[in-house]
Amino acid sequence: MGNSKYKILVLSDLKETTNYALQNAVKVSKVIDAEIEFFHVKKPTDIVNTDSQLSAMRSINKEYVVTEKKINELIAPIIENESITIHSSFAFGNIKNEIENHINSCKPDVIILGSRKRKILSFVGDKIINFVLKSHKKTLIIVSNGTDFDFEKEFSLDFLKQGRRVIQA
């Protein structure tokens, strides 16, 4: 896909819905001829467990290699089977700040997120989905586990939330 007019950003936590989000991103990109960008953020507190600076640096370097390998293992089969390019990147830091910075720098037209399974006692909800909904006026596709949506057929499964399109696939 040489000169694409549109950009799709897949935001992932590298958990169960990541594969579905990527598959749906590929389907959407074929329909609208878009580039796909994959982005993952991890909190530093999930990586570093010690107070020692040297151990912290070691943990960060190890997690960098592990995360890069995980992302490549996820993306490589899709790139090979679909003959498309997927640009990937990841960051360690404050999740909301890193997502906001990446969205501002890449300027996507469509953002695809995977939704988590609802917990029985969930009072707050999914903070990242709500954050993206409130702070960015882009088309947002929220993919749940097991979703295999056919974007080539006509559909009207979208609804307006806060004055913009949100598609729940």
Locate each region found by the language model.
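Short, well-ordered secondary-structure micro-motifs
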Residues: A21, V48-D51, E100, F123-V124, ...
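Structural beta-alpha unit
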Residues: M1-N3, P77-I111, R165-A169
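A short acidic, glycine-rich active-site loop
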Residues: A56-K69
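Gly/Ser-rich helix-loop-strand patches that form or flank binding pockets
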Residues: H102-E152, F159-K161
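Short glycine/serine/threonine/alanine-rich loop segments
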Residues: A34-E35, I84, P108, K138
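Short beta->alpha linker loops
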Residues: V66, F90-N94, G146-T147
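General small-molecule cofactor/ligand-binding pocket signal
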Residues: E37-F39, H87-A91, I141-V143
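Small/aliphatic-rich secondary-structure junction motif
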Residues: G2-Q53, F159-A169
